[in-house]
Amino acid sequence: MHSFARHRHSPAGKESAKETKGLILNGGWRYDLMGWFHDTFSFRGQWRELRKRTADLARIQPGEQVLDVGCGTGTLAIEVQQRVGRAGRVAGIDPGTRQIAHARSKAARRNLPIDFQTGVIEQIPFPDQTFDVVLSTLMMHHLPAGLKRQGLAEIARVLKPGGRLVIADFKRKQERQGRAARFHAGGSSMQDLMALVKDAGFSEMETEEMQPARFSAFPGAGFVRAYKN
């Protein structure tokens, strides 16, 4: 069974407080409810499609090391483990302790060696240049701009040179937000997100959109793919 080295990182050289916050993240019951909603109803298939498209855009290869930031109950990480195979390694971090417990249980039932840890994007608990790929789905909108900057800097730190980052998030200012989006902070501006990704040391950025299906609670999403310089 593969394992990752643990790392306690603070830019100032000291242990910093975990700061990730938001309506879902601060309200444990809301966070657990959304995890259950995603896994049970799958936005009428669109959450499943979003996971697949995220992994496809990342161009994940057998044997690679992949981190899922904001992994929730581990559904995407489990699917990614199947892509990297036993020679690869997958880790997931999430601020929700119940989410991580559920993710570990799901992986254990499938006998998958995924390293799920409670953690936040602004303090990723892994050494520099550990991962080939970092994924983030439907979590950036929880964060104010300052935490996005910190988190993207941390992602750049743990990615290997040339590593790939794929972010998928609800889009901002949808004409039909849908019930699911009301649990969140209004979605993300893809232009603003791309600027932050570039400032964090990424290049070759590409974007893609996923439109909502008719009568679906899913509000539509945007994807950003970029490579670490």
Where are the regions that the model predicts?
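Conserved class I S-adenosyl-L-methionine
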Residues: 2-59, 75, 102
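C-terminal alpha-helical "lid/dimerization" subdomain adjacent to the S-adenosyl-L-methionine
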Residues: 15-22, 44, 164-225
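Glycine-rich helix-loop-beta junction characteristic of Rossmann-like nucleotide cofactor-binding loops
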Residues: 56-61, 83, 124
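Class I SAM-dependent methyltransferase SAM/SAH-binding core
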Residues: 67-69, 73-123
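Short glycine-dipeptide loop
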Residues: 86-87, 159-164
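A short acidic, Gly/Pro-enriched loop at the edge of an enzyme's catalytic core
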Residues: 122-133
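A short SAM/SAH-binding and catalytic strip from SAM-dependent methyltransferases
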Residues: 133-146
